[in-house]
Amino acid sequence: MSVQFTSEHVCYVNCNYCNTILVVNVPNNCSYNIVTVRCGHCTMVLSMDLAPFHQARTVQDHQVQNRGFQGNNFGSYDIASRNQRTSTAMYPMPTSQQQVSPIRPPEKRQRVPSAYNRFIKEEIQRIKTSNPEISHREAFSAAAKNWAHLPRLHFGLSVADGGGGGGSN
């Protein structure tokens, strides 16, 4: 076993939002009292107080550092400016005392509907208001046919140009 002294110190931080353990490399010459860490799992920003780290660092300077826990098992990090959203403490943990929490998947984010989906939805509503007796399937089919003729207008081409739509001209 070889002793490695690096210019960084490894700390483990628990994200308060998704309960992911983050591995944070803090430079030994870091003069900030508070740094910001972004969780790579849920993108939550955590403000870290380095005062306990600076006190504990002097005790642990003689221990072996960076024992191979820099992989992706603990999420990722991003040390940014002093932007504070959530406050939490950061304590360096010896590698023999680390605790692995179960990692929950991030919540699904609502995506913005595509132009096609918006067009089809609006077109089905338009077709059904003009003809309430039509089935949803028939309205969808008509809307899809309308979309097939529409793209040449979206690309800045006029009907007179005769280009664009992928139909047989």
Curated annotation (Swiss-Prot):
Subcellular localization: Nucleus
One GO molecular-function entry: DNA binding
UniProt zinc finger (C4-type) residues: 15-42
GO cellular component, one term: nucleus
Keyword Ubl conjugation belongs to the record: no
Keyword flag Transmembrane: no
Keywords of the record: Developmental protein, Differentiation, DNA-binding, Flowering, Metal-binding, Nucleus, Zinc, Zinc-finger
Distribution of this protein across tissues and organs: Preferentially expressed in flowers. Expressed in leaf blades and leaf sheaths. Does not show polar expression pattern.
GO biological process: abaxial cell fate specification; cell fate commitment; specification of floral organ number
InterPro entries: HMG_box_dom_sf, YABBY, YABBY_C, YABBY_N
Principal location class: nucleus
Cited function: May play a role in floral meristem development and maintenance of stamens, rather than in determining polarity in floral organs.
Family note: Belongs to the YABBY family.
Classification via PANTHER family: PROTEIN YABBY 1, PROTEIN YABBY 6-RELATED
Comment field (misc): YAB1, from cultivar indica Minghui 63, was shown by Dai et al to be involved in regulation of gibberellin (GA) biosynthesis, to bind to the 5'-TCTGTTA-3' GA-responsive element of gibberellin 3-beta-dioxygenase 2 (GA3ox2) promoter and be transiently induced by GA in seedlings. It has to be pointed out that this YAB1 sequence differs from cultivar japonica nipponbare sequence by seven amino acids, of which four are located in the zinc finger domain.
Protein name: Protein YABBY 1
Species the sequence originates in: Oryza sativa subsp. japonica (Rice)
Gene: YAB1
